[in-house]
């Protein structure tokens, strides 16, 4: 844990169909400790904070990595620590691969995408752009939460719907959906001090596969019992503590 005078900049990278609201409970705890925090709304998320953001036309690993690099340079950030959740973990990994000198030696992967999505699901995912947001939010939330989140389902669902309320456009949403199921962290190569934090009941990533990815990058891995993929909603206090102890 760092002291108050040496706090590094933290750059949070949200997941697909998310925006900065999804990580806000965790982010606020770090703000309260005095950390410099950046948490942009990354396309296809609508820019709810009216920030000056880079333009994203290339919804690929290189495109997203370059978007993050441009954001870092445009805001004069001094090698921020990347903290990526879900699809954000792929973006963080892509950035570490392509622009390692722009970011800190430490990198955090929350609910890391540790394995490729089955091919039959890949063909279905882009179709969600044509379904009502409330319906998709309900189905996705119901599927992704673990045991511990079930008693807070309504609260979690409200945040999920808030995050998915508005996108840049349908074309971007489809492109991002395709990106989200084409990559896994293991597709990239980088030499960073990695921290993996995942729910033990994550339905998108088997614990055994997440362990393999952590081993590849010689990273520290922590599983949160009874939590699913949405650890940022289910156990924000514990997630904050796990990140904070390794900063």
Predicted features along the sequence, with ranges:
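Conserved HGGG/HGGXW glycine-rich cap/lid loop of the alpha/beta-hydrolase fold
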Residues: 5-50
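Active-site loop/oxyanion-hole signature of alpha/beta-hydrolase fold enzymes
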Residues: 39-81
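Gly/Ala-rich beta-loop-alpha elbow adjacent to hydrolase catalytic centers
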Residues: 84-92
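Flexible "cap/lid" loop of the alpha/beta hydrolase fold
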Residues: 97, 105-134
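Conserved alpha/beta-hydrolase catalytic His-Asp/Glu region
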Residues: 118, 135-189
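Short beta-strand/loop motif that positions the catalytic acidic residue
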Residues: 190, 196-198
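Conserved alpha/beta-hydrolase "acid-adjacent" motif
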Residues: 203-209
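Catalytic histidine-centered segment of alpha/beta-hydrolase-like enzymes
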Residues: 227-240
